[in-house]
């Protein structure tokens, strides 16, 4: 019997993923996974621990046998030290970086706009080389941002994520191109360092070998060899086998080392007088001095591996060596000659082949630790210059390390990276999955990477070496497609930055549970079987020929004795979000991509509900995302409330876990935690104590299980529109809470200090009714757009006083100051309830920016029910907008009277080839109703159930099911289970074995003519809500130049009546409507005021005038020295004056219109 058939037993009732107290899921998995899913945040946390040299990292490195014994900060300080003055008489060196305690907790940092950071100290030693005197001090190097335990950084109160960057690895790369004229194969090689000048060799169409140093002019390669000290005889002895190199040597005019050095100097420094010494120094500095040139450990490793150098030796040199250059030239000429292998100096045989730059053996990850380390290096090099200058200017006797060091460049470099780098991003906190995916993202963009404009198709495409390392499905749809990816579930990053993936070792055709992590290069040397290959109890393959893959993604059938490794899991190749799509194997990749991306846009609902049909990944994803609370020690729940849970541990210690209550996420969604344990309950270490947003019982719960019918309905669900039941609105099934933060500050201005107050000029008492005595709105107040949240007045500029007014003021004292209302108001289109207020004041010693005396934040929560125009989606890329919400009684219903919740159109399935949604619907129905498989009296099962374990023969109603990707429920199992579903209370089985039911029209009660697919599908409410998009304007801000309304909701702009819309008007001959649209409704400044006046007075609309954009066009032409005049029908010139300005301004003043052409920044500015 196959091992795969028995093993599903293990996952039926035991806790999933080794997490105690985990909810039960009935699993269809056939493949036993020997390896636990690794920590999903390890890519972030491990890298940062290496940077700061944490003890946990040192222990891990020792266990892995990694020869790196120092952390990232130690490395960079060692690289910088010693800093010597220009004469070498004194030096300053740094060592022993260490951190103090962090200044404030993560919650306090978010609340007070602080950075979560710890003070960094290093030991600095100043040595006077003349006297031998040593002065040692501990020096403060600034506050260093620390990573939270969730893998994020808190910078100025906002949570940010540093994305890992995919870059070309330093090393040596051989390439081949075809010459267009001669059709010859031309070979070239680039030696790319981590830092420093590039060295390029190539063979041209005349069969000579050339070299380019630092991308300058090409010259014969023998010039470089001679400059390195090689004689013609040595070159002939080493390269005598190569005709092309001998031909190059003949064409080389330089005689000896000196001439070669001068020749190189002339090409690198044209215009400067060449000398032998300066040429020697230049060449040494370019490639052989570690201050200017650094291959990095990974570059040295790659060169050694490619060229077969220093085999078995520890990786030491970070600069180029003479042997590297010679071996590279030899490899190039052998490649051009068509050789397939060469013997390296150490006797190692290495293959000679062209490199694939898109292979994951040649692309590596710069993780967060390395990115920060590079930025610190920039800051320290700036500081180094300052230190050198101070050494020369200060008195030697008085110098101490503290007087030499200026930490400002280092602090500024770190701040610049976290604040402005393309790779330090505002964290996506829409839901726990979006945050987790953001931390596991791989980006080829950013400094030192690609740009989306120049990236071609090859670098964006899926590559065989991505298997198990980067997900082939999850990537954005826009211009970044293929440049941004996501780390696969089991992948990890090795010390060199290459992504490794685990494989089960196969020994003599027997699969063992020993797991090896392989890089893409190592994997190419092996034959790998897939995870679902059939094996027996002993781990031997049952088939004579097994499907395997070899180098380059080629697949073939081979004997079991030829297999080296086997995949550890069927979900090994995909990312976390993709692994949460059930029946992924039945979905087209384009739609699966949309499904993976749209799960990240799910809005947390008021009540979360875990999916009936999951994949078994939901628990690990939710736990590792960090939005649920996990028990640290085994014990008993002592006290519980909505705000906290106290656990008394078995060792006698107490720990209180505080909940986040209705907090605002970065995206304005509601992050709320609630306990799921009871008082007196025993809890294990690692057990989930409290659910967060989008989780239920510790499982990821992004949407709702809804009863779906797949059928057209009166054309209302045409083109992906969705029909919903009114029940979902009334019972708040798809209701979400959104929290907006509004902020205002009171500053010092030139005319005096602004003031937060209730005393606002020209405002009625009704407007101030909900403000307290300070002028701040009360918690619990219902507000709508235009309501005052915080009252604020700003001093106005006072006009010059007349002598009489001055006299009166002198007699009667200070007149009330002139102030204007600059209160914080609810923006256009927003409503809600005030749920929180934070006031920061300089008087209370709060840390505020310069010039700010007081800062007030108001949090407004909005409960958004589902409505027409909101966007819903399944997990298979099946998305749509709600077209109609029907009363419950009008929805189609089943034979027992149950109305369906949602109607999807049948046309959304076949063309898009995402059949997974239909299978999910059927399996959802099976899980909802439960099942019982009939066993014959002699104990025989139906054929389709022969492989199901004992525990799956029956299940109660509302059973949660796991169907893992590439290892889920099969079609015959679904058909059989549909026939075995439990009947309803009337003893009726409403859905047949084909997954279809007779539905009745809710309006007439008549049955529909054909059976309809009915079942439960997991539906997600996306962040694209109609409330955030709908927008209308009557009057508002205008552009300063064209005087046309601005565009976009954010600018309170108008609707653009564009070129094609004008054509439509012309086609229908609607001349007057078109004239009105192009003039008085847009940029006829005079006309629009007169129209306003006419409407107010009830008069006829006046004739339109000349649009402002026409005047702009005239000015444009006049600026080109073209004298353009506008003539009337009788040939008289028309002036472009604005008519009677006085009448216009008088009318505008009477009507309360602001005619100043300033572009208003906000809607509030218009009101002022």
Swiss-Prot record:
Gene Ontology biological-process entries: DNA-templated transcription
Recorded GO MF terms: DNA binding; DNA-directed RNA polymerase activity; ribonucleoside binding
Reaction(s) catalysed by this chain's protein: RNA(n) + a ribonucleoside 5'-triphosphate = RNA(n+1) + diphosphate
Domain of life: Bacteria
EC number per UniProt: 2.7.7.6
InterPro entries assigned to the protein according to its UniProt record, in alphabetical order: DNA-dir_RNA_pol_bsu_ext_1_sf, DNA-dir_RNA_pol_bsu_external_1, DNA-dir_RNA_pol_su2, DNA-dir_RNAP_su2_dom, DNA-dir_RNAP_su2_hyb_sf, RNA_pol_bsu_bac, RNA_pol_bsu_CS, RNA_pol_bsu_protrusion
A Gene Ontology cellular-component term: DNA-directed RNA polymerase complex
Keywords: DNA-directed RNA polymerase, Nucleotidyltransferase, Transcription, Transferase
Span of the signal peptide: none
Recorded family membership: Belongs to the RNA polymerase beta chain family.
PANTHER family (alphabetical): DNA-DIRECTED RNA POLYMERASE I SUBUNIT 2
Quaternary state and interactors: The RNAP catalytic core consists of 2 alpha, 1 beta, 1 beta' and 1 omega subunit. When a sigma factor is associated with the core the holoenzyme is formed, which can initiate transcription.
Purpose of the protein: DNA-dependent RNA polymerase catalyzes the transcription of DNA into RNA using the four ribonucleoside triphosphates as substrates.
Record's protein name: DNA-directed RNA polymerase subunit beta
Higher taxonomy: Bacteria, Bacillati, Actinomycetota, Actinomycetes, Mycobacteriales
